[in-house]
Each structure stands twice: as C-alpha cells, then as structure tokens.
Amino acid sequence: MGLIGWFSEVWQSMGCFLSIVCWLMKKMFGNIAVVGATGAVGSIVLELLESRQFPCRTIKFLASKRSAGKRILFRGEEHVVAELCPDAFKDVEIVIASTPDEVSLEFTPWAVEQGAVVIDESGAHRMMEHVPLIVPEVNPEAIDHHRGIIASPNCSTTQMAVAMKPIHDAVGIQRVVVSTYQAPSGAGLNGDRELLEGSRAFLDQTKYEYQTFTHPIAFNLIPQIGSEKEAGYTSEEMKMVHETRKIFGDESIQICPTCVRVPVVNCHSESMLVETRNPLSVKAARNLFEEFKGI
C-alpha cells in the first residue's frame, strides 16, 4: 500500500523532544537546565517551553565557553547564559540538551552523577543498549527503563515512526521504502544561512562559497545527507534504519531510505511506501490515522 505523510520538521522533531520532557514531568517537577540554549535547536526549545508554559521551579541556560555570558529573553525576563561545566548541574533534575555528539558524551556523566535526568537530542547515546530511544506516541513505556539518559531520535526517524505506529500495531510492517525531503535547517544555523545567502548570490549572479553542504543548496537538490556508509547509504539514511528498529523493538523491519536536502527554509517531508505483514485496505489505514494521536 502507498502512504504519503507530510510533517513539519520543527513540530515533529522538537515536539517529540519536549513531549519526552512532558512525560517525565508527570512524575517529577523541579529544576531544569537547557544545554545548547544559544544554538538553532536550543532557540526552538525555548520557544516551545515558553509557548507551552512549561512548569518548573527554576530554569538555567547553559552553553559553550564561547557563548557563555550571552543574554536570553525568556518569559519576559532576561537570563544570562552560563558556561557548561561539571558544577553547572547542582540541584538540576531535568536536562534538556541539544549539542554536538562529542559535547554530549563529555557533559552527560557530569549531569547524571549529580542525579539529573538528561534528555539528549544528539546522536551520541541513541544506539547505546541501556539508553531508551523514545518517541512518546510510539514507545512511551520504554522511558521507565532509563538510567539517567533518555535519547530523542533523529528528526527523519521520528516522522516515520509516528506514521508507522498505528499500522504496525494493527497488521505489522514488513518493509518501508521512504524518501525524505529535508530543509537546510537540519544542518543548523549555518544551513539556513547558506540557503538564504546562496539564493541571494544566485539571483544577483555573484559568487558564493558554500561550506556547510557538499554542493550549492540554493535552487538545488542534494541527494546526500551525512557521510557515506555501507552499501552506498548515507549516515542519515542508516540512522533511519537502526533507530526505527530499536524504537519498535523489531529487527526484522526492512527499511530502504533515500534522504535528500531540499532548498526550503524549515520543513522536512517524507514519502513512504509501506508493505504490511497482513492485509490492510486504504480505508482502514485512513481510519487508523484519524484515530491515532499525534498525526
């Protein structure tokens, strides 16, 4: 059966990220730290925390030494960004983190040793056996098995997993052929900048030096996201394979992904062809989607 799902990158990826926090907050209410607060994802985290009136006693904002000292406006008040260091997590109960993998591997032990639960948006811990990889609409029960770190999946994985969930539960999924159309924002602030500045240079017929992407992104499609991996797939594509199997606890699901960078500012989209284990009509599939929370 053919199914096309269109989702917003920010809502699905960051919505999943904060939904994990909300799930935890059903059981605890305390002091929050946002790591990577000045980055592209961190700024969206702050917007969502504010728009959802997220409940907490205190909140602190942490970033690298280079960004420490910057000021952030949150809930009408100005906050100074503190430097990320071992002492920064004293009395912190929940850490919401969006950093490069190597930074995550360095600071998460500091936070966990001081009793905090780290919700990590990076890829550093996703495939570690003892770290649950959570999409709240798909496998919320796995969150109870954390040992201080809860991983959030890659954005393209999250989109696909949410669409797969009602079908997988109803009739099982044998195989998924998925194509993604991902915005430059997935590469951070530099990705957006190269799209906008490169587009202007193209229209003005001036030269522009691209650094974030392997080819010009303005008015172009780049069929490679991440580095090249086994069998000609890219690292982004292999994330979709391995992470999805872990989330569903099903190593038998066959996934054939193609990830393409497209010249739009914010949205990621996916087209999915799903082969089910048992018969399912289009009408029945539509009904499953209509009844499923999160779609």
Segments (PLM) and residue ranges:
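Residue-identity detector for glycine
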Residues: 2-5, 15
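Charged docking surfaces used in two-component/phosphorelay signaling
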Residues: 95, 184-295
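N-terminal Rossmann-like NAD(P) cofactor-binding subdomain of oxidoreductases
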Residues: 26-217, 253-254, 287
